[in-house]
């Protein structure tokens, strides 16, 4: 099969948000499969330009997330999924690159859902994506989404609020504008209106539009990606959303065979994401 269009996924997500759509409490027992998916070098170049990553013979570490996003969303927007895609929150993302993927490669894609579980704030599910070149898996990803609802764990106490840390000057400052996020949405194929439409963002509880989590996950790598080994693991945990426009400070600590990254609100010090990069 070929990947569905972003518009088709968006329409299915909107239809799936209607309360008349029945939902099961089980994950779909199917795998979305795409054979011989070509990579568009022009799209890779546009992705690199908007995120600040390098454009060369190999795709950036996070690019396959954008490449395979239509396949992931075709699974999540199915009416056999246990909850609606609209309003789901991206909480974590774990990428393992076993070997670089060339911009000239055609790849195979496999996406499945697993590990549906309860959380204090709702239901968590993992979307597992494998990207293959030939017969070998080159890139593996586990994307975790949260659907907010009451569960048996809803009465658990919230973690105590963290005190504002005393921070040194950041290693870099990211200035993120609504225009940049609209460009990322066009390039990355994630047209969720909470990122591009202030009215839609308010309907989902945000005071204004927010940056895509995977935009920030890509942008924080710009200063260190030239030093990555070919085989690498990148784990990201998302915290408070980036309200646009935003100025965020990037803090980088090197050691233990890799890097620890934190993107923080410059005024209040709270984290937008924490991440680790480690060689395999």
Swiss-Prot record:
Task: Reply yes or no: does the keyword Cytoplasm apply.
Answer: no
Q: Where is this region: Disordered?
A: 149-170
Q: Per the UniProt record, which EC number(s) apply here?
A: 4.2.1.-, 4.2.1.55, 4.2.1.119
* Start and end residues of each MaoC-like domain: 162-256
Segment forming the signal sequence: none
Q: What is an example of a GO molecular function annotated in this UniProt entry? A: 3-hydroxyacyl-CoA dehydratase activity
* GO biological process, any: fatty acid biosynthetic process
One Pfam family per UniProt: MaoC_dehydratas
> Keyword set for this entry?
Fatty acid metabolism, Lipid metabolism, Lyase
Q: What happens when the gene is disrupted?
A: Deletion of the gene does not affect the biosynthesis of all three types of mycolic acid.
* Catalysed reaction equations from the record: a (3R)-3-hydroxyacyl-CoA = a (2E)-enoyl-CoA + H2O; (2E)-octenoyl-CoA + H2O = (3R)-hydroxyoctanoyl-CoA; (3R)-3-hydroxydodecanoyl-CoA = (2E)-dodecenoyl-CoA + H2O; (3R)-hydroxyhexadecanoyl-CoA = (2E)-hexadecenoyl-CoA + H2O
Which cellular components does GO assign to this protein?
fatty acid synthase complex; plasma membrane
The family note in this entry says: Belongs to the enoyl-CoA hydratase/isomerase family.
What functional role does this protein have?
Shows trans-enoyl-CoA hydratase/3-hydroxyacyl-CoA dehydratase activity. Displays a broad chain length specificity, with a predilection for the C8 to C12 substrates.
UniProt protein name? 3-hydroxyacyl-thioester dehydratase X
Which organism was this protein described from? Mycobacterium tuberculosis (strain ATCC 25618 / H37Rv)
Name the gene for this chain: htdX
């Amino acid at each position: 099969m070929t990947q569905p269009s972003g518009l088709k996924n968006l329409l299915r997500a909107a239809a799936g948000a209607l309360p008349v759509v029945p939902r099961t409490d089980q994950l779909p027992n199917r795998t979305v499969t795409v054979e011989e998916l070509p990579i568009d070098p022009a799209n890779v170049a546009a992705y690199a330009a908007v995120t600040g990553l390098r454009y060369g013979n190999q795709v950036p570490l996070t690019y396959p997330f954008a490449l395979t996003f239509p396949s992931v969303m075709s699974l999540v927007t199915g009416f056999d999924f246990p909850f609606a895609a609209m309003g789901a929150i991206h909480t974590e993302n774990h990428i393992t690159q076993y070997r670089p993927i060339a911009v000239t490669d055609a790849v195979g894609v496999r996406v499945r859902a697993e590990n549906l579980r309860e959380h204090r704030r709702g239901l968590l599910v993992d979307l597992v994506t494998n990207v293959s070149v030939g017969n070998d898996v080159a890139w593996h990803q586990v994307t975790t989404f949260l659907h907010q609802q009451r569960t048996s764990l809803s009465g658990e106490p919230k973690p105590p609020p963290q005190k504002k840390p005393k921070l040194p000057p950041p290693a870099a400052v990211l200035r993120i504008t609504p225009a940049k996020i609209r460009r990322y949405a066009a390039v990355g194929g994630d047209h969720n209106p909470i990122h591009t439409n202030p009215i839609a963002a308010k309907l989902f509880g945000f005071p204004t539009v927010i940056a895509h989590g995977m935009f920030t996950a890509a942008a924080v790598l710009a200063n260190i990606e030239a030093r990555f080994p070919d085989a690498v693991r990148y784990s990201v945990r998302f915290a408070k959303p980036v309200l646009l426009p935003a100025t965020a400070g990037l803090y980088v600590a090197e050691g233990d065979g890799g890097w620890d990254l934190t993107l923080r609100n410059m005024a209040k010090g709270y984290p937008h994401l924490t991440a680790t990069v480690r060689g395999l």
